[in-house]
Structure formats: structure tokens, C-alpha cells
Amino acid sequence: MAAPEAPPLDRVFRTTWLSTECDSHPLPPSYRKFLFETQAADLAGGTTVAAGNLLNESEKDCGQDRRAPGVQPCRLVTMTSVVKTVYSLQPPSALSGGQPADTQTRATSKSLLPVRSKEVDVSKQLHSGGPENDVTKITKLRRENGQMKATDTATRRNVRKGYKPLSKQKSEEELKDKNQLLEAVNKQLHQKLTETQGELKDLTQKVELLEKFRDNCLAILESKGLDPALGSETLASRQESTTDHMDSMLLLETLQEELKLFNETAKKQMEELQALKVKLEMKEERVRFLEQQTLCNNQVNDLTTALKEMEQLLEM
């Protein structure tokens, strides 16, 4: 097998990009760009500038390669690397939620560095005299790897997006349940507070009544000469109680003697009353007898007068 001949130096691979210019359509005067449109336009401008710089660098490298004899051009490899850089510089907001501009610029600056190293490796392989089929295989593998990575990242982000609403719904449901539980607990606490307040009012009233009763009891004990703290009588109260007891005993003795005398006098008076009663009865009997006697005498006189009158009538 003979080694493949190198192509002539004047042959150059050129790729034509699709025209990005679009027909200008007139916009209404009230048209206003949204914030995400302005961010996308800025990112697209940044990617085109980066791609242009890479193309210029690749053209310079290819110019130096053309000057060296027996070296193939590297236009195709640089174009594939530019495509990769443009794909890597696309805004991640197109695949998932938009990120801030600082992170996007950092991603673009980081993605530019390894691309140049890849270009150098591929150019080394080309300078070493490898066949063109190897170059196409490498470019295809890189494209497939980039597409697979992009699809993996897109699917992961889509899965994350799909799971977010479920987690939000769960969190909202949990929050609602917690709020309902808290409301029920608050109601129970309010009820307990009202009940305890009512019990406190009742207890305060009972305490006030007990304090009044205690004050009355203390006043009574002090009036009787009792010590409420010790629960015993004091010396002065004891002396007073002894004197009072002696006085009461003397009074009792005198009362007993007086009662005895009263009983004796009462007995005598009863006897006298009975004698008076007998005398009164005798007097009453005498009065009755005298009255009857007078009545009898009057009747006798009447009868004698009547007899005299009858005798006179008979004599006539």
C-alpha cells in the first residue's frame, strides 16, 4: 500500500455559512423588546464575535501552513471547532431557565480555551500525514459527543423542570396542612385561655370571700382574748376569765339563795291565798243564805196578808 499523495498547495477547503440576514419587517411604533429578547441578542452578538476571532486565528494558522511545503490545509478542522465553540457558547437559557449574564460570559471564556488546544492536536495529526478519513472520523465523533452531551443536559434539565411542580405542589400541600393544624391549635388555645380566665375570675372572687371571713374570725378571736397565731389564751385573758368566773360563781350562789327565799315566800302566800279562798267561800254562802232568808220572809209576809184578807172577806 502506497501512502496517499498530498493534495496541491493551491487547493483550499471553504465552507459557506447560511445567510443569517433576514428580510426586515417593519415593526409598529408601540413595539417594545422584552428583557429576555435583549439578553438573547447580546449573547448572540458575543458568540458571533468569538466565532469571528477564531476564524481569523485559524486563517492565520492556515496561511503559515500554506507557506510550509507538503502540509495540508486545516480549514475544515477550524470550521468544525468554530461550530463547537458556537454551540458551546449558545445561551443556556434556550435549554433551561435563563442564567445571569456573568455566568454566561464565564462559560464562553472557558469554552474558548480547550477548543484551541483541540485545534492544535488535530493540526498535529494533519501535519503528521494522516489520511483525510481520520479527520472526518474525529470531527464526526466530536460532533456526536457534543450532541449526546447536549441531549443529556437537555433531558436532565427537562426532568428537573418536570419534577419542580410536583415538589412545589407537595410543599404547598404540606404548608396548607400545617396552616390548618396551626389554626386548629390556635382555636383550642383560645378556648383554653377563655376557660382559664373564667376560672381565674371565680377563684379571685372565692379568695376575696375567704379573706373577708378570715378577717371576721380574727376580730372575734381578738375580742375573746384568744391568740389566733398560737391558738391559746393570753395571760391577761386568762386573768380576766378567772375573775369573771369568780364573779359568775358568786352571782350564782346569791341567785340560788334568793330563789330559795322566793320559794318559801311563795309557799306561804299560797297557803294564805287558800285560807282567803275558804273565807271568801264562807262569806258567799252567808250572803246567799241571807238572801234566801229574806226571800222566805217576804213570802211569809205576803201569805199572812193574803190570809187576813180572806178572813175579812169570809166574815162579811
UniProtKB/Swiss-Prot annotation:
Tissue: Widely expressed, including in skin.
Region: Interaction with SPAG5, residue numbers: 159-316
Induction notes from the record: Degraded at the end of mitosis. Down-regulated upon exposure to nitric oxide.
InterPro entries tied to this protein: SKAP
GO molecular function: microtubule plus-end binding; protein homodimerization activity
Coiled-coil features, chain-numbered ranges: 166-216, 248-316
UniProt-annotated location(s): Nucleus; Chromosome, Centromere, Kinetochore; Cytoplasm, Cytoskeleton, Spindle pole; Cytoplasm, Cytoskeleton, Microtubule organizing center
Sites of Phosphoserine modification: 128
Any one GO CC term of the record: kinetochore
Principal place of residence: nucleus
Gene Ontology BP annotations: cell division; cell migration; cellular response to epidermal growth factor stimulus; chromosome segregation; microtubule cytoskeleton organization; mitotic sister chromatid segregation; regulation of attachment of spindle microtubules to kinetochore; spindle organization
UniProt keyword terms in alphabetical order: Cell cycle, Cell division, Centromere, Chromosome, Coiled coil, Cytoplasm, Cytoskeleton, Disease variant, Kinetochore, Microtubule, Mitosis, Nucleus, Phosphoprotein
Keyword Cell cycle: yes
UniProt comment concerning the protein's domains: The coiled coil regions mediate binding to kinetochores.
Assembly and oligomerization: Part of an astrin (SPAG5)-kinastrin (SKAP) complex containing KNSTRN, SPAG5, PLK1, DYNLL1 and SGO2. Interacts with SPAG5. Directly binds to microtubules, although at relatively low affinity. Interacts with CENPE; this interaction greatly favors microtubule-binding. Interacts with DSN1/MIS13; leading to localization to kinetochores. Interacts with MAPRE1/EB1; leading to localization to the microtubule plus ends. Interacts with PRPF19. Interacts with DYNLL1. Interacts with MAP4.
Disease linked to the protein: Roifman-Chitayat syndrome: An autosomal recessive digenic disorder characterized by global developmental delay, variable neurologic features such as seizures and ataxia, optic atrophy, dysmorphic facial features, distal skeletal anomalies, and recurrent invasive infections due to combined immunodeficiency.
Function: Essential component of the mitotic spindle required for faithful chromosome segregation and progression into anaphase. Promotes the metaphase-to-anaphase transition and is required for chromosome alignment, normal timing of sister chromatid segregation, and maintenance of spindle pole architecture. The astrin (SPAG5)-kinastrin (SKAP) complex promotes stable microtubule-kinetochore attachments.
UniProt name for this protein: Small kinetochore-associated protein
